[in-house]
Every structure is written in C-alpha cells, then in structure tokens.
Regions:
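Extended, histidine- and acidic-residue-enriched regions that form the cofactor-binding/catalytic faces
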Residues: 1-83, 87-103, 109-231
C-alpha cells in the first residue's frame, strides 16, 4: 500500500490496524555514465515497496533529495543544506504523527544522509520532550536502516560482485535500479571497468580528479559489471 496512491479514508482505515509507515529516503546525484541520478532514492523505493507489499505496511512518498554537495559539479545533482533537510524531515514526521502514526521507519539509500538523518531524529525527540502535553501523547519512534545493511544483502552483493563492489555507483545498486526500471537501462562503455579510488574535498575537486568517469570516490564500485537480472 502506497500513501500517495491511497485515499484519505484508506489511510484512516489503515491507521485503525497499524501505526507504522515506511519512508524511502535517498538522494539525487550522479552515479556515473550508466547509473541513474535517482539511484540512491530509487533503491530504497523499490525495496521498500516490495517489503510493504509483502508485509502489509504503508509506504510513504520517497524523500528523494538529500546531502549531495560533493556531487554538485555534475549536472543534474540536487542537494539540500543539512538544516533544510532536517527541517523538512521534522515537518514530514510531525505531519504523519498528527494523523496518528507512531512508528516511522526511514529506509535510506545514501550514506551521505546518515549524519543528517540522525540529527533530524534528535530534533524530533527534542520537540516531543519539550512539549508539555507529550506525556499524554502516544510514544513516537523513528528508525533508520540503510538498505544495504538489511540481513543478507552484503553477503549477496559480495557473492554476485566479488571484485569491485565499492561504495558509490556500485554494481549492486545500479542493478537494483535496472531491475526496477528496465526501460531506463544505459549501455555505456566502461573503461576501466573498475573505477579508480581517491579522496575528494569538495564538488569542484571531485570533478577535477574524475572528469570523465565521474561516479567515484573512495572505494567506488565497478558499475560496468551491473545487470538488471541481478537486481
């Protein structure tokens, strides 16, 4: 069940039996010449929808823009300031809590979001603590899980891609998006097939160091190995 494809009476009926909602959260940023800009949002969205269908959990609209300032030299990347993202997550959560949701499960697809999501949770809990009527309200709980940390995921990734899995524009995450959106598969020559490693400082430094094969930073993946059937 997806919130944005539901009516308000359907959501009201859902709340009568469950107070939980899953929110996919990610980023819109470059993932190299064959990886979709929405990869970090699409992966938790695809996985979250499947999990929601199987478990009967409501899945909210995807929070698809996050912390991507270091990718801003690559066209199409969109980023938020940490303060903006925290404020948006706070309003998002309070809106859901106002309707009666008590368990908000954020399924994350972008490592760069983790610190800001954690800070947002602190803001949310501070708000609850400072609300003098808080003791009369049902407990509100927020949870964060990165999709690649779900049970068995990394073992499967290493099994499918024993060389070059990396941590950005990985063959596993690109394969998930190709599985979900086969019409968007990009066929691009990858030379070398495994991207070089290296530190970056900021957006311009990133583009200077990796002007063509643009998806990489430390321990970047070999997205030349991805296949939609492996998603």
């Amino acid at each position: 069940m997806q919130l944005h494809l539901s009516t308000w009476p359907e959501v009201e009926a859902y709340l009568a039996k469950s107070k939980a909602v899953l929110i996919p959260i990610g980023s819109t940023e470059q993932h190299g010449p064959n990886g979709l800009l929405g990869t970090d949002a699409l992966c938790p969205e695809i996985i979250g929808k499947r999990a929601g269908d199987e478990a009967g959990i409501l899945v909210g609209p995807t929070f698809n823009v996050g912390q991507a300032q270091h990718h801003m030299s690559f066209p199409g990347t969109i980023t938020l300031r940490p303060s903006t993202m925290i404020a948006a997550m706070l309003d998002w959560t309070q809106s859901l809590a106002r309707h009666g949701f008590e368990r908000i499960y954020w399924l994350n697809g972008h490592g760069g979001n983790i610190a800001t999501i954690t800070s947002a949770f602190s803001e949310i809990y501070h708000g609850v603590s400072f609300d003098r009527s808080g003791a009369n309200h049902p407990p509100l709980r927020c949870s964060l899980r990165n999709w690649w940390e779900l049970p068995g995921v990394m073992d499967l990734c290493r099994q499918l891609f024993p060389v070059g899995e990396g941590s950005h524009a990985t063959p596993s995450e690109v394969s998930v998006t190709w599985f979900g959106y086969p019409q968007a598969v990009k066929s691009v020559a990858m030379t070398p097939r495994i991207a070089p490693n290296g530190p970056i400082l900021d957006a311009d430094d990133y583009r200077r160091r990796f002007p063509e094969r643009v998806r990489r930073w430390s321990f970047v993946g070999a997205s030349g190995y991805c296949r939609n059937r492996l998603g």
